[in-house]
Design a protein with these regions (language model features):
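Boundary/linker segments flanking structured domains
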Residues: 1-197
């Protein structure tokens, strides 16, 4: 899959100019320098040989090597813009954390890096929110395509084809390329960082 639009997360955090509200599909690219740390918690379950041989999931962006680890759809009323705001600018509140309203991708990255979302029982861990934002600002680039005429079902079909024609270990739902054990492990560690002791 070739994506037309591209912007570093740090730039998107500063300004949403040029990002439209059309529905579409997007891809998260992670700097290769961060992969060992990011995937350490699930290293025994990630097929690194498979990941390394997926040529379409590797490229040089802005002078650094990147690997695509996650693909998603933006089918809501605010399309790509709304989805990026949710993934990038979402505030961690006690209610959002407890009710599971934090973006699954934010929870997954936080869990993999052991950034606890709550502390002292029921207080938001603002340091973890800041650490997560810094991590994605320094290590992630987003690419996307708009599909203004596609329905949510059509977008899900395209997303499914992309996920299952490659190896995207951070995609859980509908991903036939990762093991049940890995899905269970990701769910477990996501629950751990959101739980109240």
């Amino acid at each position: 899959m070739k994506f037309v639009e591209q912007k570093p997360v740090s730039d998107i955090r500063i300004t949403k100019d040029g990002i439209g509200k059309d529905v579409g599909i997007y891809c998260w690219w992670f700097r290769d320098d961060c992969l060992k740390n990011l995937l350490n918690e699930i290293s025994e379950l990630v097929d690194l040989n498979r990941l390394n041989t997926e040529k379409e999931q590797h490229k040089v962006l802005n002078g650094s090597k990147y690997t695509a680890l996650y693909v998603g759809i933006a089918a809501g009323k605010d399309g790509i813009l709304g989805r990026f705001k949710w993934h990038i600018n979402q505030k961690h509140t006690v209610s959002n954390v407890q009710k599971g309203y934090i973006s699954t991708l934010r929870r997954t990255i936080s869990a993999l890096l052991n950034f606890k979302l709550l502390k002292n029982g029921a207080e938001v861990n603002l340091q973890s929110q800041e650490n997560l934002n810094t991590f994605i600002d320094e290590n992630c680039i987003l690419e996307w395509n708009y599909y203004p005429k596609k329905t949510k079902k059509e977008l899900e079909h395209i997303e499914d084809e992309i996920i299952n024609s490659g190896y995207f270990p951070l995609n859980i739902q509908g991903n036939k390329q990762i093991s049940k054990e890995m899905r269970d492990k990701l769910s477990e560690i996501r629950d751990t960082i959101c739980s109240i002791p």
